[in-house]
Regions:
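Positively charged n-region of N-terminal signal peptides that target proteins for export
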Residues: 1-4
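Structured catalytic-domain cores with a bias toward divalent-metal coordination
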Residues: 17-410
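Hydrophobic h-region of N-terminal signal peptides that target proteins for export
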Residues: 10-17
């Protein structure tokens, strides 16, 4: 029933995405520096502010700014102290199970698990420190324990292989059929209705054989593999539409934790966690994972975005006309006078967290300019309304590159 409700929610959300408007212009109540100074929070105060939330997203304006990763090192322990127990990454579902096994049981090698080239931006000393800290807490007896999850459905072939391996143990006859069904999403798949329909039959078949599968394995393993079959369904759509279908699965996978009573910390890019749709190179808006979460959870979802004024960061650069690329250090482009980084720099602080719920002063309300970069360059500059997009912002004056552990090429 809960899964049905979540699926229905995801179907209904797009009709409501653009109805939300939280920014209210208020008259000038003080100078920008004074207003920002009065609102600015330290990390401990921020953790208390969001303690009653079910999900707190820690968004990144670039995927590889040290100061934002360092903030996670500081914020995660404080959020865990307020009952948050799941650290969910914008990262692949199956591959990140190795990190969960490490923090839960101490098995495996977290350094090897983070060395995943498509998600190179998490393979940093800062994130490794968070993972090792989580393991230390669990080893000391923290109850309930901290879990780590990948919530991205971008590698369904890996997950499909897991499902088939499970079926080979509990139902060898059907395992062969499932393997044949999943074969259609082999390398180079571009999407067919026949494949999509066939893939969607695996999960109902597993449901119909629940008792036998639980008897042959365990309830926990059965439920995990049943959901893995759902990840394959999600991933088939992602393979076809790439990043334009990433967000609904991420939201659905987060809500699965919430439905179990777990409080979640999200790691990922700003644009995925904002409470409204976002734009990339194309004109049309993309419903964000955060927009689905905002409708599902209301004020129990807190989206902390981030911004930087200047400095450097890491991103992949592809040479013109060449399909190969490498990770390089890049400088933020110069901000326009109406850039959010410029507005927040008026506080003359190197870093601060500023809550944005409620009426905003006239100089901050409404639409201004925002620069951001993903895992690749170029840097994009777009209009944005932070009052509608985020519940708060982590401002960093000067960005420096993350402490990357490996430097893959592409």
């Amino acid at each position: 029933m809960k899964r049905t409700a979540l699926a229905l929610l995801l179907l209904l959300v797009p009709f409501a995405l653009f109805a939300r408007s939280r920014t209210v212009r208020s008259g000038p109540i003080d100078t920008p520096a004074a207003w920002l100074g009065q609102r600015a929070l330290g990390h401990e105060s921020f953790a208390r502010l969001v303690a009653s939330s079910d999900v707190v997203a820690l968004g990144d304006i670039t995927h590889a700014t040290h100061e934002l990763h360092a903030a996670k090192q500081s914020l995660v322990p404080r959020l865990v102290a307020h009952g948050f127990r799941v650290i969910a990454f914008e990262a692949p579902y199956s591959e990140y199970k190795a990190l969960d096994a490490y923090v839960l049981h101490g098995t495996g090698d977290p350094e090897a698990a983070l060395n995943l080239p498509p998600y190179w931006f998490w393979d940093t000393n800062e994130i490794l420190d968070v993972v090792q800290w989580a393991r230390a807490q669990n080893a000391a007896g923290l109850t309930p324990p901290i879990r780590i999850a990948g919530i991205d459905a971008t590698s369904p072939r890996v997950t499909a292989a897991e499902v088939v391996a499970y079926l080979s143990r509990v139902d060898p006859a059907y395992a062969s059929e499932a393997a044949s069904i999943y074969h259609c999403i082999r390398e180079g798949y571009t999407g067919t209705n026949r494949c999509r329909t066939a893939i969607s039959t695996v999960r109902p078949t597993m449901l119909s054989k629940r008792d036998a599968y639980v008897l042959a394995s365990s309830l926990d393993e059965y439920e995990e593999m049943l959901y893995a079959a759902r990840i394959v369904e999600q991933g088939e759509r992602v393979l076809v539409a790439h990043r334009y279908e990433k967000d609904p699965p991420m939201a659905e996978n987060v809500l699965r934790f919430v439905s179990r009573g777990q409080k979640v910390i999200l790691f990922g890019h700003n644009e995925h966690w904002g409470r409204i749709a976002y734009q990339l190179e194309k004109v049309e808006s993309i419903p964000s994972a955060g927009s689905y979460l905002a409708i599902a959870l209301g004020s129990r979802y807190f989206a902390l975005g981030s911004m930087v004024l200047d400095g450097t960061f890491l991103a992949v650069q592809y040479e013109p006309g060449v399909r190969s690329g490498s990770i390089r250090t890049h400088a933020m482009t110069a901000p326009s006078p109406d850039d959010y980084g410029v507005l927040f720099s008026l506080a003359e602080r190197s870093s601060m967290i500023v809550p944005l719920r409620g009426p905003l002063p006239s100089w901050l309300a409404g639409t201004h300019r925002m620069r951001f970069a993903g895992s690749t360059v170029p840097i994009l500059e777009v209009p944005a309304d932070f009052g509608a997009k985020f519940d708060g912002v982590l401002y960093v004056r000067t960005s420096t590159p993350t402490q990357l552990r490996h430097w893959p090429t592409f």
